């Protein structure tokens, strides 16, 4: 969203259930439905972005919803190192996934942003020092709960 605002766009959020777009960007008299994807999977020198949906936060029924370019106008992708792409939906080939970082979608790469947090990274230990630790679970388990 920050990138769209930096380009002069207004940002609007759909109210209620909106399975096909995450937000609406307004540029003058034009509205664009935007779907956002994040990716930390880096294999074979490319970011392997999954663009299909496999249930989300609901219990998975086994049905895969493939990407359909008619459902949104742009796909905005942020990858682990902060690189970003704003890809017109019509330019996306494939319904399950795309590989970014090579020549195919390079014309749609925009300015990088902040890197994504490392989901496997170690958090620093707590520096909380309680004077009366009796009965505190940290006495047995340490500072990492």
Segments (PLM) and residue ranges:
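A short acidic/basic microdomain associated with nuclease active sites
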Residues: 1-26
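Conserved catalytic cores of phosphodiester-cleaving nucleases, focusing on short active-site segments
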Residues: 4, 23-25, 30-40
């Amino acid at each position: 969203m920050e990138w769209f605002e930096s380009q002069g766009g207004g940002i609007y959020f759909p109210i209620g259930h909106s399975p096909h777009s995450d937000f609406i960007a307004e540029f003058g008299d034009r509205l664009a439905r935007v779907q956002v994807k994040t990716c930390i999977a880096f294999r074979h020198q490319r970011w392997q972005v999954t663009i299909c949906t496999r249930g989300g936060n609901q219990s998975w029924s086994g049905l895969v919803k493939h990407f359909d370019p008619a459902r949104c106008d742009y796909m905005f992708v942020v990858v682990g190192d902060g690189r970003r792409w704003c890809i017109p939906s019509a330019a996306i080939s494939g319904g399950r996934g795309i590989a970014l970082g090579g020549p195919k979608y390079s014309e749609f790469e925009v300015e990088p942003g902040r890197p994504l947090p490392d989901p496997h990274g170690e958090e620093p230990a707590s520096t909380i020092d309680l004077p009366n630790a009796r009965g505190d679970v940290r006495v047995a388990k340490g500072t990492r709960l």
